């Protein structure tokens, strides 16, 4: 009886380990034109999220949620959090998120709200 219980526990532990190992890790890359891949020949292949996905391989699913000219600042001229891509990134329910926002926040019309940057980032 003792051997059966130990065997069952061992089987459960191995099953959990194997199941955990098969889980694909989802990565959402959010950001501005740099994330989107502006300036590359083929953003679907050459943007940093695409290259990251190629480098990480099969155990990872990397999606690009970049939108050109977007800001972190909610009072900025094009706030990322008001975009459909932001809602899609949330719905994706990623395990890891990379954020590349801030470049467009330094434009004069946006930087006047710099005191809100930390609050908007939270």
Indicate where each model-derived feature is located:
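A generic signature of intrinsically disordered, low-complexity regions enriched in glycine/proline
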Residues: 7, 36, 50, 108-109
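Residues that line or immediately flank small-molecule/substrate-binding pockets and catalytic motifs
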Residues: 8, 31, 101
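Acidic/histidine-rich helix-loop elements
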Residues: 37-44, 64-81, 107, 111-115
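Alpha-helical cap/lid subdomain in secreted, periplasmic
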Residues: 2, 21-22, 54, 77-122
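Bacterial Sec-dependent N-terminal signal peptides
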Residues: 1-22
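Serine-esterase "nucleophile elbow" of acetyl-processing enzymes
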Residues: 19-67, 86-91
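Amphipathic, positively biased hydrophobic alpha-helical segments used for protein targeting
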Residues: 9-11, 18, 42-44, 48-50, ...
């Amino acid at each position: 009886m003792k051997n059966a219980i130990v065997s069952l526990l061992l089987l459960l532990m191995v099953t959990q380990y194997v199941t955990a190992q098969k889980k694909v890790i989802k990565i959402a890359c959010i950001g501005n034109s740099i994330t989107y891949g502006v300036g590359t020949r083929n953003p679907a292949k050459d943007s940093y999220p695409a290259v990251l996905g190629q480098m990480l391989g099969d155990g990872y699913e990397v999606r690009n949620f970049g939108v050109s000219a977007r800001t972190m600042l909610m009072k900025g001229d094009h706030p990322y959090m008001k975009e459909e891509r932001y809602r899609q990134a949330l719905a994706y329910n990623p395990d890891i998120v990379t954020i590349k926002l801030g470049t467009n926040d330094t434009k004069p019309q946006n930087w006047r709200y710099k005191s809100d940057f930390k609050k908007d980032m939270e």
